[in-house]
Structure formats: C-alpha cells, structure tokens
Amino acid sequence: MRVVVLMGGRSSEREISLKTGKAVAKALRELGHEVYELDLDKELPCKLLEIKPDKVFIALHGRYGEDGTVQGLLEILDIPYTGSDTIASAVSIDKDFTKRIVKSLGINTPDWETFISEGDVLNTEWNKFPAVVKPVREGSSVGLKIVESLEELKEYALDLLKKTERVMVEEFVEGRDMTVGILKGEALPVVEIIPKKGVYDYECKYTKGMSEYRILKDEKLSKKLQEISLKISKFLSLKDFARIDFRVTKEGKIFFLEVNTIPGMTELSLLPMAAKEKGMDFKKLISIIIT
C-alpha cells in the first residue's frame, strides 16, 4: 500500500508530532508499505495529488491535525485517512464542547467555566481552588497551569487569551490519572499514570522519568472505565484509534477529562503500552490502524 504519513504541522505540538510520524513511518516500512513522509505546508494538496496515496496516516497533533482541518482537505481530495472524521475531530478537540456532551450523557466531569474575552475573565467569580487553567483547543496539556487564587487565575487566563481564542478554568479534582485507549471500537486495558508532580502536564508527558505508568489491575474499576470510554467513543463517532483521559478520586468517583483523537505514538506513549498488554507489538498496532 502507498501510504503518506502526515506529521509536523504548525501547532505547539509540532515536535511531538514529528516523533510520532517518524515512529509510524518506520513501522509501516517494516510492514512492507511504500511510505512518504510529508509535513503540513501550503504545497500539501499538490504533493498528495502527485503521490496518489492509497491512504494517509495522520500523525499530526493539535491544531490543523486533530481539529478536522486536514481531515476536511483529505475528504475534498477523496483520499482515505486514518482516525476520526472532520466532524468528530472538530468536536473532540474542543474541551468545552466535549465536556458539555459528556455531561449530557450523565458522565461526571469537573466543573468548569470558559472565557472568550477579557471581560469574561475580569468578571468571573470562580471560587474553587486549586483550579486548572488551559486553552480550550490544545492537546498534550500545552498551556496547562494549576492556579491557587482568583488573582492568579485572572492573570494567567488573560495571558493565555493573547495566544488563543478561548480559555477554560476547571475544578482540580484530587485523584489518580487513568487513560483508556480505543482501537477499532474496542477498549484497551486501562493505563494508570503516576506523574512525579501533582498534574500530568507537558513536561511529565514527554520527559523520561517524570511519570510512571502501569496497567490497572483493579478489574471492576477497569471495566467501568472501559464502559464509559466506549459510550463516549460511540456518541462522538470516534474511528480507528483514540484515547480518553479520566481522574478517579479515592472514593472511586470517575471524572472525564478529555478526548485525544490522535494519541501520541512515541516511546513514552500510552496507547502502544495498552496495546502491548493485549499482545500487540507496535508494528501490529500500526497495521491494525492502517487497515
């Protein structure tokens, strides 16, 4: 099969995307595919029309890759691609919209408030601290910060609004971080994330030694997390592969955090770890996604 691996892009997650793309391209070549590695640029449509790929493996993270933009382009060009479609991608990258949907399904999610203007920030009466402040449409915990006071919240949110269109503040729920990989409509084993500091931020995700990971052995909790993940996945019409993040309190209450429609495929990535627990090595995982 002639496969284009699309990586890089212009989002703040460019470097992680390049790592994912290189790993995917290597696996595809070892599987016998004819592989082309392309960055996201203005010449992309022309390059794709020239190569005429059988499929595009989207290894882009964040803006333009996970928000439905490149999916829409590929649909216009009538080129099949991996992952969720334009609408599912656009919905899932929007943390505010996704939380509204998940809440409507009867699933717990931390309380939150979204700011679209300086006035929203200055007039907020948010009073739950500590709290998490982050961009609405970024991944890999880019821009995420824990704040301890209303003054700190306003200062950081105003700063973020200079760089992004919308910002949200979210209740900080004390508990354990869990993530569930979805592969072709099946929930993979649950991975527990143990960050060396209080929150699983960009540094903890992509710096060796900053987090520990283990397969959750609590069968009852695992089953519940998998059931919730499949419910969310089906409602959002996620395709091929995805990852859904949760926080579980010491009382066992489950809170949905966010959806990742193009989870990382680096040496520290969690979806390959979960797949390995099911007996799939990295090449097997990529083979399943591409078919």
Curated annotation (Swiss-Prot):
Gene Ontology CC annotations of this record: cytoplasm
What residues does the ATP-grasp domain cover? Answer: 99-291
Give the subcellular location. Answer: Cytoplasm
Q: Which UniProt keywords apply?
A: ATP-binding, Cell shape, Cell wall biogenesis/degradation, Cytoplasm, Ligase, Magnesium, Manganese, Metal-binding, Nucleotide-binding, Peptidoglycan synthesis
The molecular function terms of the Gene Ontology recorded here are:
ATP binding; D-alanine-D-alanine ligase activity; metal ion binding
Entry function:
Cell wall formation.
- Family assignment? Belongs to the D-alanine--D-alanine ligase family.
Q: What is this protein called?
A: D-alanine--D-alanine ligase
